[in-house]
Amino acid sequence: MFMANLLLVILPALVAMAFLTLTERKVLGYMQFRKGPNIVGPYGMLQPFADAMKLFTKEPLLPTTSTSMLYLTAPALALSIALLLWTPLPMPXPLMNFNLGLLFILATSSLAVYSILWSGWASNSNYALIGALRAVAQTISYEVTLAIILLSVLLMSGSFNLQSLITTQEHSWLLFPSWPLAMMWFTSTLAETNRAPXDLTEGESELVSGFNIEYAXGSFALFFMGEYMNIIMMNALTTTIFLAASYNMMTPETYSINFMAKALLLTTLFLWIRAAYPRFRYDQLMHLLWKNFLPLTLALCMWYISMPTLTSSIPPQM
């Protein structure tokens, strides 16, 4: 039964990821006054499957100077971690109901750094190594703010369990009392998923695709799938943390539809930002985090810690 439930989570997530690639190309196409994919199938709907067929039927290449075991393990690890992150997510009922669901997501997402580092180092290419080093520094840095923002949210909901966040937001979204945190969280998720304007790790103009330059065929497709799964996952998590819908046990499908619509809107915002903004310089990216986001998130976290103590000391009014 668990395997059936696992497949019912993984397969729709993979289908969503496939159509996200098509949505991105369509959105970017229309924003640049062109059509985007429209040949394969009606309105280009079969384009993701054609891309997958092309990539997985190409000959897998292994560079002669590469460290083969790490080189082959890295793409599989990237996709596995992206899929593993879905297990504690309530949609409305999670696959596995952890008491420490948010901590699990934070710890597992930080493991994705290893796949990027291994791929950059094992490829034995200077471009790949520079891309990997940038990715590691960027991801680890932005995880600091993500963790502090999550801590602030936990202080408001009172539990590490993701289901309790839905209960907390029955009457009002957490977006309203903590909108500065939500804005910083969204910007940090852009950097965490290596998306524009924070896609320094695979800057085509200077690093020729970055850490995955030596990858081709199926292994490249696995990295690509892992990246897009992370985008959907991060937006689903943002929806759960800041925009959760009220859950009615009699009609669970209304929660799922609401959840999917919000995640889709946030994902479209990711694509819109990619079309609209140029890439940051690396020092600007780090300056934004360490000089701006970190002091702000720490100050807000201290505010949320001190507020209950402050209000409990006020005597009752007659």
Swiss-Prot record:
Protein name per the record: NADH-ubiquinone oxidoreductase chain 1
Reaction(s) the record says it catalyses: a ubiquinone + NADH + 5 H(+)(in) = a ubiquinol + NAD(+) + 4 H(+)(out)
Topology relative to the membrane: Multi-pass membrane protein
Biological source species: Saguinus leucopus (Silvery-brown bare-face tamarin)
Alphabetized UniProt keyword annotations: Electron transport, Membrane, Mitochondrion, Mitochondrion inner membrane, NAD, Respiratory chain, Translocase, Transmembrane, Transmembrane helix, Transport, Ubiquinone
UniProt-listed HAMAP family: NDH1_NuoH
Superkingdom of origin: Eukaryota
Function statement: Core subunit of the mitochondrial membrane respiratory chain NADH dehydrogenase (Complex I) which catalyzes electron transfer from NADH through the respiratory chain, using ubiquinone as an electron acceptor. Essential for the catalytic activity and assembly of complex I.
Subunit structure: Core subunit of respiratory chain NADH dehydrogenase (Complex I) which is composed of 45 different subunits.
Subcellular location: Mitochondrion inner membrane
Main location: mitochondrion
GO cellular component: mitochondrial inner membrane
InterPro entries: NADH_UbQ_OxRdtase_su1/FPO, NADH_UbQ_OxRdtase_su1_CS
Single GO biological process annotation from the record: mitochondrial respiratory chain complex I assembly
Gene Ontology molecular function terms on file: NADH dehydrogenase (ubiquinone) activity
Keyword Kinase: no
Family: Belongs to the complex I subunit 1 family.
Enzymatic class: translocase
